Regions:
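Extended polysaccharide-engagement surfaces of secreted carbohydrate-active enzymes
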Residues: 63, 68-281
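Aromatic-lined, polymer-binding surfaces characteristic
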Residues: 1-114, 120
């Protein structure tokens, strides 16, 4: 197999983790018992999941940022759900998923622009159907009531939000929802969360004065990350963004046009494109 001993040691081989690995997993188990090679394929896929996923760390944040997080959603849900049904063990019990629920909420509160990290984050203007659908899946599979309240808050004003993007290639969870009959849990909600949360291993922090009502909330996001500008992360080290009413006030500049063009490098990825606190002031 091409990926053996390479993928395990790659910090973030984006497309493989986003889609190829999930597709390989499902294909390998489909032909298990019919093709001799499938024994090795299934063993590799299962143990690679245990070793490297669901996240690169334990705090639950996504170092590649707010936009490219979304293209991993199907993998983050469908693979552990498959193993859960196969074995009877809930693979969503990994503590990473509880931290990731907080990442979903704090990095982009209901009806707010995203915290502002990673390639193409400027396009993430409000929680998408795939993001809300992911929070819905997390709430059902982990019992996280904060994620459940996040879904209820947004669905109350956007009743069809879970239908938006529900069949998209990377983030659509329609197939999961057809299979999962677990209810949304009840309990503490957004108003019961602390004002802020720090994700120390990923180097992210987000603070909101009113997660329960974005219209009356000021928000600040901050990044100083050991992952640097690797992969789809950008060079916004020691950088912050500020928001009011879900809208950005002081925010990053530029657009993700490509990895190497002048605008993409200097006006989007580079440190000067962000509200960066430099070491010399």
């Amino acid at each position: 197999m091409h990926d053996i001993n390479r993928l395990e040691n790659h910090i973030a081989d984006n497309h493989v983790w986003q889609m190829t690995f999930r597709i390989l997993t499902m294909a390998a188990f489909t032909v298990y018992g019919e093709l001799p090679e499938a024994d090795a394929w299934t063993d590799y896929c299962y143990n690679l999941w245990l070793a490297r996923f669901p996240g690169l760390n334990k705090d639950g944040a996504w170092h590649n940022g707010d936009s490219y997080f979304h293209v991993n959603i199907r993998t983050l849900v469908e693979v552990p759900y498959f193993y859960t049904r196969l074995t009877g063990f809930n693979y969503f019990s990994d503590p990473w998923y509880q931290g990731n629920a907080l990442y979903v909420i704090y990095q982009q509160p209901p009806f707010s622009k995203s915290g502002g990290n990673g390639s193409s984050h400027q396009k993430i203007l409000t929680p998408s159907g795939t993001r809300v659908g992911y929070a819905d899946a997390l709430a059902r599979m982990t019992g996280n009531t904060f994620a459940a309240d996040y879904v209820r808050h947004i669905s109350a004003r956007q009743p069809d939000i879970l239908e938006q993007g529900s069949t998209s290639k990377a983030g659509g969870l329609a197939w999961f929802r057809l299979q999962c009959d677990k209810p949304l849990p009840d309990g503490p909600g957004l108003k019961d969360l602390p004002m802020g949360h720090v994700f120390p291993q990923s180097g992210l922090a987000s603070f909101s004065t009113n997660l329960d009502d974005t219209r009356k909330s000021a928000m600040l996001s901050f990044r100083s990350s050991p992952y640097g500008s690797t992969s789809h992360a950008i060079a916004n080290q020691n950088a912050f963004n500020t928001f009011w009413n879900g809208q950005s006030l002081f925010y990053s500049s530029g657009h993700h046009t490509s990895f190497t063009d002048i605008h993409g490098v200097y006006c989007h990825r580079a440190t000067r494109a962000h509200n960066t606190i430099l070491v010399n002031g």
